[in-house]
């Protein structure tokens, strides 16, 4: 079985919205061994929808559509598909009751007009919308397209994602005829070419049915080990062996064997070690603190964050020596070290990280160009001694890109220190 994804909406074609639905659907289908052969984006025009659906049903056994199920005039997917298949619309009472209950909870009146949202194509399996109003549908398209299935879902990402996970994937899993295992390996502080060299032997000896993909990201490179086959136990075992071989060779660069953001692993590590953290930021403007506190459970380890953007704030809030700034400049490793030490001592945290740099577009010099950042990590030993280490990095990007990369480097430095023996 293979699939085609159709994303409907003029807003996608005009660039007013980024299509995040198609990648999500493709990833979900991949977990049950259904590859996507094509992704189509088409307008709200009924003829465009009709052409796209007909073409997709001729190509693939499963066609998944998003968009065009709402109550407005440009939501034409349901009507177009109904006419294409020569079927009527029927009222789905459970869907209407779900919609009505949602409106009652919000204190809004329930009207007859809402019944239009609960109309589904005759012969379809209703996909409950647990996050919104319009239900989805799974339609077996015989006799026109024997052995073909059409899935209609709303274009709102949160609604579509719930439908995929709760109903659509469980529906198609028994039909896929294959087992597939995807295992992500997240690395940091290493480029694609260097990583490829480290694991070249593993890649050269990949068993049949297993593939390896490189996906560069801000922290480093994520590897995706994918294994498919007809027997689940064999697929799992083969995938595990390849993952183990890669990790054995690249262990010092691997920070997670799952799809995880760097800040998630930092927080998890802090909680495991029962350690607390504080951050002192200049050029990143609170981004590190924001990323850490975005992680659920971070209140158990995150003490405080200071944005000491000016030199005066560095001196007053962190105890940085003004002579250090005067002699070496605010963007220097000694200043970063004093920021981290001051943050550690004044917060009472077990570990602290600091950033001072030049995000751009102005402020650079030949000696310290835009993209330069100094990052320091300070931590306490078991005896209470403080260790501080700083490094300088050079990034290339616009202001927002540099800030994001600076924060990534700081989180990476934090995690490296946390993983050191004795931390």
Swiss-Prot record:
Protein name: CinA-like protein
Entry-linked SMART domains: MoCF_biosynth
The organism's taxonomic lineage, starting at the top: Bacteria, Pseudomonadati, Chlorobiota, Chlorobiia, Chlorobiales
UniProt family annotation: Belongs to the CinA family.
